[in-house]
Amino acid sequence: MSRVKRGVTARARHKKVLNQAKGYYGARSRVYRVAKQAVIKAGQYAYRDRKVKKRTFRSLWIVRINAAARQHDISYSQLINGLNKAGVELDRKALAELAVYNKDAFAAVVEKAKAALA
């Protein structure tokens, strides 16, 4: 068995981590040991926040739908209930898009929901 020296692989590994840590503040972008921890933590935050992003956007859509619905004298929960009873299968993302960019179409959807509730 010949002796394995780690010079090339270690340098490559260090370089990879330090490239991932580019733009970090201070030692986090320069010192391998610190940069490695920073990159691992950044990966954890990124993984977690990819999940949180979905929740955040759903909350944003609900806020927008609620604001637009209240301009038509109906609450968000009543609107969703009415849409379910009317058999309208628009998701919250689409409803929020209508509420912001196509107010006439949103008004028609609200009328449909109100009719189903009456």
Swiss-Prot record:
Cited PANTHER family: 39S RIBOSOMAL PROTEIN L20
One GO cellular component, as annotated: ribonucleoprotein complex
UniProt family annotation: Belongs to the bacterial ribosomal protein bL20 family.
Signal peptide limits: none
Entry's Gene Ontology BP terms: ribosomal large subunit assembly; translation
Keyword list, A-Z: Ribonucleoprotein, Ribosomal protein, RNA-binding, rRNA-binding
Taxonomy of the source species: Bacteria, Pseudomonadati, Pseudomonadota, Gammaproteobacteria, Thiotrichales
Species for this entry: Francisella tularensis subsp. tularensis (strain WY96-3418)
Known function: Binds directly to 23S ribosomal RNA and is necessary for the in vitro assembly process of the 50S ribosomal subunit. It is not involved in the protein synthesizing functions of that subunit.
Protein known as: Large ribosomal subunit protein bL20
